[in-house]
């Protein structure tokens, strides 16, 4: 146990030194950062190539890149600028993004979402235990950490939250590579302001698994402030960033002046967002269904998944309409689901959660010593800020001040991350942006009596380095135990323990005589290094808070990187096969529909019985081939079957149009272009 050394002597020289130490940092921060930026540009950034900015969200993710001084938010292969943070596993393939979410209701136990709620946490953590009750997929315990258990490639597999997050990052990376036409290796990734060190480390590990060097972890509200502040640099502004996303809620108070962004205070709730609003509506609609049909769906994960999907759509609709109808065909036991949900009912179900978001707003104002009237702007970030009641409550809290809506709330964080990425890669036009971030929780060590002694206060600008002198608690004490904690409680045991280490071989001396200097170094990513040095002997020990907090080992990361590459190869091989199969199946069904069309202009009305029978037989044979060889046939075999069907159909359709329209008919019934829309649905 340590005790704080209370004996201080300040000589004239020491006082002068202290004054210099205080004055110099005040005089030179901008000069120092400018020099660092120049050094980076000259020596390091060439090796980075293009650096991308990724908003790795709980429910949706988004990627941006700075090109020629302008940020581009990139669309995925479905044309969407936000991608669901979903990963699904089937007997033959892995799906990520829209394709994974679209099949969730039919593959409930093997579709993984909300993984951000688990990353960097221990299995026994209260939050993990709470999540396990709600998540439809299986969570197991491995080495004290949660892992996802799924069926994939006809075997049971377990994946860590870092691996699943790595798969989502791989998707975002591939979106950027498709756009840029080159390989991407470096990124800036955002996290909630309230993520602790373990969660930040785990996010970096996920980037490594995805083949990305994560140059910087940036707080989401800070990234949003960058997006907001680029064109508003005249004078000083105090801004509240109110970030209500799908799974997390963060509030930050920032000061923006002359391109300098300083986070003054942060607060939030790691388990509050749009999905929680959805859950309350799902619970309500489930009870309504039970009353009407006497069927309890609470244990039916497939039904809950269907209802959850439709509830999310309804919630979005209610942001612009007063009511909407939720309809699901064959919901349970062949019974259709049909209910009207009004905006008023949605607000009634969630009003307590909406009001709960105001507490962190009060907290950041209190932490920074600000009044409501000191706030110049309110910035809305996250899709859930589109909810009218949320905006109304927030504006009422600020005595009628209107929230700024100049940023697309879904894209603001990725935009800011892309700007920071541009800074790190040396992009023109962004070199004058300075980012001052803060640590979200107080950091300290346990001293005599179990007290939490603070070294770095909550909301201290980072990077930072703080030292303090401690001493021994007993005579001739040879060893001191340094136990590192994060949190706001007075006693160390009530806070989150980050790690521990010992400083040994302290020479015998009365208690209070040895001088043990403990130094906390917190880097720009919020990663902590703690060092203890015996000033008498010069001996020191240190720890970087990683494995003691559940971070993956290097061996684990290397293994996961290899597996990620292997899965990428499998994905590539399967993609060609699936596209060929889908192309054949869609063509056969399209042709079947044409043959059955007996309308005046339909193909069926123009065919004689023999030709119709020939086509029916060929289509039936094709569909049977698909059914019998769904998993076993190769891409080439599916393509051969399609050509066989085209060879049967083309002469018949050509004959109908006198042979002159053969090309048109072949395009209609045979060309790949005719069913591209089906091939890329990935259903």
UniProtKB/Swiss-Prot annotation:
Locate the compositionally biased regions of type Acidic residues. 668-683
- List of residues binding ATP: 57-60, 116, 246-248, 312-319, 383-386
- State the InterPro entries in the record: ATPase_NBD, BIP_NBD, Heat_shock_70_CS, HSP70_C_sf, HSP70_peptide-bd_sf, Hsp_70_fam
Q: Any inhibitors or activators noted?
A: The chaperone activity is regulated by ATP-induced allosteric coupling of the nucleotide-binding (NBD) and substrate-binding (SBD) domains. In the ADP-bound and nucleotide-free (apo) states, the two domains have little interaction. In contrast, in the ATP-bound state the two domains are tightly coupled, which results in drastically accelerated kinetics in both binding and release of polypeptide substrates. J domain-containing co-chaperones stimulate the ATPase activity and are required for efficient substrate recognition.
Task: Indicate whether Nucleotide-binding appears among the record's keywords.
Answer: yes
Which processes are annotated in GO (biological process)?
A: ERAD pathway; fungal-type cell wall beta-glucan biosynthetic process; IRE1-mediated unfolded protein response; karyogamy involved in conjugation with cellular fusion; post-translational protein targeting to membrane, translocation; SRP-dependent cotranslational protein targeting to membrane, translocation
Kindly indicate where the leader peptide sits in this chain.
1-34
**Region called Nucleotide-binding (NBD), residue ranges:** 145-299
Q: Which PROSITE patterns match?
A: ER_TARGET (PS00014), HSP70_1 (PS00297), HSP70_2 (PS00329), HSP70_3 (PS01036)
Q: Name one GO molecular function term.
A: unfolded protein binding
List the keywords (alphabetical): ATP-binding, Chaperone, Endoplasmic reticulum, Hydrolase, Nucleotide-binding, Signal, Stress response
Q: Where is this chain's protein located in or outside the cell?
A: Endoplasmic reticulum lumen
Tell me its EC number(s), please: 3.6.4.10
GO cellular component terms, alphabetically, are:
cortical endoplasmic reticulum lumen; luminal surveillance complex; nuclear membrane; perinuclear endoplasmic reticulum lumen
Q: Reaction catalysed by this chain?
A: ATP + H2O = ADP + phosphate + H(+)
Q: Where is this region: Substrate-binding (SBD)?
A: 419-519
- Which top EC class is given? hydrolase
Q: Where is this motif: Prevents secretion from ER?
A: 680-683
One Pfam entry for this protein is HSP70
> Which CDD domains would you find in this protein's record?
ASKHA_NBD_HSP70_BiP
For region Disordered, the annotated ranges are 595-614, 655-683
- UniProt key word Membrane: no
Which NCBIfam families does its entry note?
Answer: PRK00290.1
The family annotation for this protein states: Belongs to the heat shock protein 70 family.
Role this protein plays: Probably plays a role in facilitating the assembly of multimeric protein complexes inside the ER. Is required for secretory polypeptide translocation. May physically associate with SEC63 protein in the endoplasmic reticulum and this interaction may be regulated by ATP hydrolysis.
Query: What is the designated name of this protein?
Result: Endoplasmic reticulum chaperone BiP
- Origin organism is Debaryomyces hansenii (strain ATCC 36239 / CBS 767 / BCRC 21394 / JCM 1990 / NBRC 0083 / IGC 2968) (Yeast)
């Amino acid at each position: 146990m340590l005790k704080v050394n209370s004996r201080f002597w300040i000589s004239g020289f020491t006082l002068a030194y202290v004054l210099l130490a205080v004055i110099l940092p005040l005089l030179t921060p901008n000069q120092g950062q400018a020099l660092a930026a120049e050094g980076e540009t000259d020596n390091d950034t060439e090796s980075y190539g293009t650096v991308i900015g990724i908003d790795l969200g709980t429910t949706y993710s988004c990627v941006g890149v700075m090109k020629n001084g302008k940020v581009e938010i990139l669309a995925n292969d479905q044309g969407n600028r936000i991608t669901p943070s979903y990963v699904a596993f089937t007997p033959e393939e892995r799906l990520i993004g829209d394709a994974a979410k679209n099949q969730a209701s039919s593959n409930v136990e093997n579709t993984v979402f909300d993984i951000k709620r688990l990353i960097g946490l221990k299995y026994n953590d209260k939050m993990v235990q709470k999540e396990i009750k709600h998540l439809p997929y299986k969570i197991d315990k491995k080495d004290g950490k949660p892992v996802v258990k799924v069926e994939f490639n006809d075997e049971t597999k377990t994946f860590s939250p870092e691996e699943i997050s790595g798969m989502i990052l791989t998707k975002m990376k591939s979106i950027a590579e498709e756009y840029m036409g080159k390989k991407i290796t470096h990124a800036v990734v955002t996290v909630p302001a309230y993520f602790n060190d373990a969660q930040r480390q785990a996010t970096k590990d996920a980037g490594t698994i995805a083949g990305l060097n994560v140059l910087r972890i940036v707080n989401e509200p800070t990234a949003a402030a960058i997006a907001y502040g680029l064109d508003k640099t005249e004078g000083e502004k105090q801004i509240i960033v109110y970030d209500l996303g799908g799974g997390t809620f963060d509030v930050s108070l920032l000061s923006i002046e002359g391109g300098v962004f300083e986070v003054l205070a942060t607060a939030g709730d790691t388990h509050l967002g749009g999905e929680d609003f959805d859950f309350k509506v799902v619970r309500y609609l489930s009870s309504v269904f039970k009353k009407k049909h006497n069927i309890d769906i609470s244990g039916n994960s497939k039904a809950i998944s269907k209802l959850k999907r439709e509830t999310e759509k309804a919630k979005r609709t209610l942001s612009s309409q007063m009511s909407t109808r939720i309809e699901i065909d064959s919901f349970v036991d062949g019974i259709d689901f049909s209910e009207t949900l009004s905006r008023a009912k949605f607000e009634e179900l969630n009003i307590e959660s909406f009001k709960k978001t105001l507490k962190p707003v009060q907290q950041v104002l209190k932490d920074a010593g600000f009044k409501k009237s000191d706030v110049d702007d309110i910035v809305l970030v996250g899709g859930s800020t589109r909810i009218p009641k949320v905006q109304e409550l927030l504006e009422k809290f600020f005595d009628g001040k209107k929230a700024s809506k100049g940023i697309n709330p879904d894209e603001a964080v990725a935009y800011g991350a892309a700007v920071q990425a541009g800074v790190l890669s040396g992009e023109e036009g962004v070199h004058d942006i300075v980012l001052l971030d803060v640590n979200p929780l107080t950091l300290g060590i346990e001293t005599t009596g179990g007290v939490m002694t603070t070294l770095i206060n909550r909301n201290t600008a980072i990077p930072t380095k703080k030292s303090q002198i401690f001493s021994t608690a007993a005579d001739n004490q040879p060893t001191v135990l340094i136990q590192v904690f994060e949190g706001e409680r007075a006693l160390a045991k009530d806070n989150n323990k980050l790690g521990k280490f010992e400083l040994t071989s302290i020479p015998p001396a009365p208690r209070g005589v040895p001088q043990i200097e403990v130094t906390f170094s917190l880097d720009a990513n919020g990663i902590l290094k703690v060092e203890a040095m015996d000033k008498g002997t010069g001996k020191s020990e240190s720890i970087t808070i990683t494995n003691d907090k559940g971070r993956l080992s290097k061996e684990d990361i290397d293994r996961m990187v290899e597996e990620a590459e292997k899965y990428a190869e499998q994905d590539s091989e399967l993609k060609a096969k699936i596209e060929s199969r889908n192309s054949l199946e869609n063509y056969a069904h399209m042709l079947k529909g044409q043959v059955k069309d007996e309308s005046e202009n339909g193909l069926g009305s123009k065919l004689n019985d023999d030709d119709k029978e020939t086509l029916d037989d060929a289509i039936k044979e094709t569909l049977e081939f698909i059914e019998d060889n769904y998993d076993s046939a190769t891409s080439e075999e599916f393509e051969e079957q399609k050509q066989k069907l085209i060879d049967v159909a083309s002469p018949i359709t050509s004959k109908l149009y006198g042979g002159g329209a053969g090309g048109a008919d072949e395009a209609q019934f045979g060309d790949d272009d005719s069913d591209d829309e089906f091939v890329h649905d990935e259903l």
